[in-house]
Amino acid sequence: VQVQNPWRRAGAKFGTAGRLVIMTTVAALLVAAVTVPLVGLAGIATRDVANTFNTLPVGELGAAPVRSVVYDAEGHVLTYLYPNAIYRVPVDYDQIAPVMRNAIVAIEDDGFYNEGALDPRGTMRALVNNTGGGSLQGASTLAQQYVKNVRVLQAGTNQSAVDAAIYPDLQRKVQDLRVAVDVEHQMTQQQLLASYLNVAYFDNNAWGIEVASQVYFSKPASALTLAEAALLAGLVQSPTQYDPFTEEAAATARRNTVLTRMWQLHYVTKAAAEAAEKQPLDLKRSGVPGSGCTAMTALASSVGAGFFCDYVEHVLELDYPSIWKEINTTGGLAIRTTLNLQDQRAADEGVNYVEPNHNGYFNPGQNADTEVLLTPGTGAVQAIAIDRKYGQDDIDYAVNSEYGGGAGVQTGSSSKLFTLVTALEQGYPFGHTIKVSAPSTAGPYTNCHGGYVNPATFNDSEGPTTGTEVWQMNQATVDSINVYFVNLEKEVGLCNVVKTAVKMGMTRADGRSLLAPDPSLGRNRFSADNLPGFTLGEVNVAPMSMAAAYASVAAGGMYCSPQAITGIAVISTGRQLPVQKQDCYRDMSTGVAAAASYILQGVLTVPGATAYGRAISHHAAAKTGTADNGYYAAFAGYTPTLAGYVSVFNPTNPT
């Protein structure tokens, strides 16, 4: 039962029509007060001013910003992204405890259920005071407060916009009132009350009742008790002044004021209010969660998904600029990614494993170990793992620099894939022989412009160290014979090898084409078709690019660019937003892909091969790569359903 004051009873006698007349009349006077001095009001027809109020432009209030959610492929939450760093979790009317709904109405707008967007008594008082030159006053109903808070939330970190939203001049009151009236026409009372509680500020970075319930009591808004609800309702008038963490006495007194008002309005009995007043505050503080990849869920953190998350953020920023803007302004989006938690956990464990008898060979603590896993035929990024703690080192060494990566890595002999595929495309048989010696001088070569490329001399760590030997292509691949491949590169054409790599999705680590000049120091200032050592991994690339290239062989010659996002939806409506189409194309014939896979299986199965003994129960193929006496190492491997690339390198000196 609610106690009605005389003003509300007067309005109630006329029913809805009577309340509308009162509201419009007072609104008309309020508009007049903005435009003319009080002494001139007598000469203005109320009807004319009312018409002016009714024709004021409403404008589009828009939605209050809300968090976006990033999911893995199976729907597990990875992290939340908060617009303007504001953590807000809207809840429905039924998810807010009735005592909380009653408490906020009792203390902030006891005429909520009768007067609507306008408080006539308060507005008339403000009208007389403001036009008479006194300090600015204003009557703010829940509807008006809702409008103001939405505007503050939308302003975010723009202080001038925040000031414009809360500056208490009479003109702003009129504007807010006009929008508030429109809001009331669009919402039911239940919707408006829930909406207000979802945008109210409760101090300590707690926007909305659900977050406030968690921050102060570590419970959902649906579970609030009478005493807890009264404390939170009392906060909104002056959140800092009544902060229970720092101002316990003031907060307690304010809570008790709310309880008194609740029993006066018959929301609770006097006995219940007095019992609640005797209770201690009993706070159970919880912090507001952080935003983004440094504040992932426990599940995502446990599998080391920080660098995958970072890649997703960069993809959103670069490839979905309008979506990224929406995430950072209004939010409310659900982003479905390709992350596979099982694969991510396995990759994370792999890169953080330290060989017990390494004897310093792999330079632990200085070298970085990265692993990328992709799905052949789709390009879905299953995992990105780096042996670094995300947040302490935010460089995602697995990806191109434009997506948050570094300067790329040496690939060593894993780049022999491109020469092998080129030879197979030109019809070279598995048993194609080349007589080689070590050291061996190969060349001259011809670049893609028909230019002359000087011969170069190469040594070999796996093949002959002295004398001359004859090697067949398949055996030279599994044994990774450098001097064979630089000569094979000469035979099939250096330009053709580089073009094969480009066709298989390869770029430099900064995203530029391999055929474009590189302005960096040393030999890398030339395009890749001027580098005889290209087949030995002379150009720095991102591990993800190598994983995608090998995945195309696993997919039977179908290249698919890496894809980390499969769906984006508006949480409130479920409406699906467009995502980039899968970029897949044929980069080699199925026959060439099958032939390459057959040869690369031998890396795992042929005795004496570089990865012999590492075979698994599935059909699998692989290629190893090393540089600088093993201080840089790479391993590419794939099955029909999964392709991966592992790289160990020194990030302070990747070349």
Question: Which residue stretches match the model-derived regions?
Answer:
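N-terminal type II signal-anchor transmembrane helix
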Residues: V1-V70
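Peptidoglycan glycan-strand catalytic modules in the bacterial/periplasmic cell-wall system
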Residues: P65-T269, K389, V478-N482, E489-G493, ...
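Short, well-structured active-site flanking segments
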Residues: Y113-T123, W207-I209, K270-A272, L424-C448, ...
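Conserved catalytic neighborhood of penicillin-recognizing serine enzymes
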Residues: G132-G156, S291-A300, Y428-V497, L531-F534, ...
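Glycine-rich, acidic and aromatic/proline-enriched surface loops and short helix-turn segments
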Residues: Q145-A155, N198-N205, S222, L226-S238, ...
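Non-catalytic structural connector segments
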Residues: T269-R336, R345, V351-E355, Y361-N367
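A penicillin-recognizing enzyme superfamily signal
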Residues: L333, T337-N363, E371-L373, A383-D387, ...
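Mid-domain, small-residue-enriched loop/turn segments at the edges of structured enzyme/sensor domains
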Residues: H449-V453, F458, G493-A548
